[in-house]
């Protein structure tokens, strides 16, 4: 049962990312005296897995400089339209920066002339072009489409955590957050998880 729920949550997360075309918000840490910095990015998933996310960028941008100082980051995705309200937040670490010289195979899977040539006129060999390799260690999500943590007044997203590397990938498991009944009562107000008034 747990394996089935985990697989459904992973499928839901992948669907949200696919539904928004990979467009998400990357948040990086700017240091102790500054708020986090966020910007819109396009996430690329190879082989339809959440193990590794690639983000194309210019190596001279603020995000690359910030990640060189603190590699922890998050990428958030939110759907609109038919499945409005479904969201995914990936929390993890940028493990390396990839350029054409060290990973031609990965770059060839991500590079699209129509998307990237306006920014990198020299093509994938442009010295400014690089990929950030982001490894999520936690996924938070809500998906009404897949009935994952989707109660109207639930206030508890499903959480997946990365547990073990397995050769070419990793495995994930659903994590149950320890939340007090008092905190849930405050989050939900005078209503149950389905949004119905609680009896007096």
Q: What is the meaning of each model-derived region?
A:
Residues 59-60, 137:
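A generic "binding-loop/recognition-motif" signal
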Residues 20-26, 112-117:
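Short Pro/Gly-enriched beta-strand edge/turn motifs at strand-loop
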Residues 19, 36, 124-127:
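Short solvent-exposed loop/turn micro-motifs enriched in small/polar/acidic residues
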Residues 17-22, 70, 135-136:
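A short, compositionally biased
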Residues 119-200:
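C-terminal edge-of-domain segments
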Residues 1-25, 192-194, 199-200:
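Extreme N-terminal tail/first-helix region
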Residues 62-117, 123-129:
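Short, structured beta-strand-loop surface elements
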Residues 21-59, 65-67, 73-79, 86-93:
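Short beta-strand segments
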């Amino acid at each position: 049962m747990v394996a089935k729920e985990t697989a459904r949550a992973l499928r839901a997360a992948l669907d949200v990312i696919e539904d928004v075309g990979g467009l998400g918000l990357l948040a990086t840490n700017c240091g102790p005296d500054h708020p986090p910095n966020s910007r819109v990015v396009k996430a690329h998933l190879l082989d339809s897995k959440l193990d590794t996310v690639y983000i194309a960028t210019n190596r001279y941008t603020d995000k690359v400089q910030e990640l060189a100082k603190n590699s922890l980051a998050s990428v958030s995705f939110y759907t609109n339209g038919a499945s409005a309200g479904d969201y995914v937040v990936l929390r993890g670490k940028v493990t390396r920066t990839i350029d054409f010289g060290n990973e031609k195979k990965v770059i060839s899977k991500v590079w699209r002339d129509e998307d990237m040539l306006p920014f990198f006129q020299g093509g994938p060999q442009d010295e400014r072009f690089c990929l950030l390799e982001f490894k999520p260690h936690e996924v938070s999500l809500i998906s009404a489409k897949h009935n994952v943590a989707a109660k109207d007044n639930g206030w508890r997203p499903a959480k997946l955590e990365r547990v073990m590397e397995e050769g070419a990938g990793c495995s994930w498991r659903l994590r149950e957050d320890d939340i007090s009944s008092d905190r849930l009562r405050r989050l939900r107000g005078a209503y149950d998880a389905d949004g119905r008034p609680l009896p007096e």
